[in-house]
From Swiss-Prot:
GO terms for molecular function: structural constituent of ribosome. Part of the 50S ribosomal subunit. Pfam families: Ribosomal_L30 (PF00327). Belongs to the universal ribosomal protein uL30 family. Keywords: Ribonucleoprotein, Ribosomal protein. GO terms for biological process: translation. InterPro entries: Ribo_uL30_ferredoxin-like_sf (IPR036919), Ribosomal_uL30_bac-type (IPR005996), Ribosomal_uL30_ferredoxin-like (IPR016082). The keyword Ribosomal protein applies. This is Large ribosomal subunit protein uL30. One of its GO terms (cellular component) is cytosolic large ribosomal subunit. The lineage of its organism: Bacteria, Pseudomonadati, Thermodesulfobacteriota, Desulfobacteria, Desulfobacterales.
Length: 65
């Protein structure tokens, strides 16, 4: 489970529970269509699972991004 993942916020945080908003902010996602590259760790996988209905997730082609 090594490498990196591209995570994009696909839907707005408006009207979402505070826990979901905190998870998104911790991932560095603050605006719709923002993309961040994160390490593929169990912690990040858990965060993605919590808010998967708001995200678009892609595996990064290489770890340099």
């Amino acid at each position: 489970m090594s490498g990196s993942i591209k995570v994009t916020l696909a839907k707005s945080m408006i009207g979402r529970p505070e826990k979901h908003r905190k998870v998104l902010r911790a991932m560095g996602l603050t605006k719709v269509n923002r993309t961040v590259c994160l390490q593929d760790t169990p912690t990040v996988q858990g965060m993605i699972r919590k808010v998967s209905h708001l995200l678009r997730v892609e595996e990064s082609a290489d770890g340099s991004e």
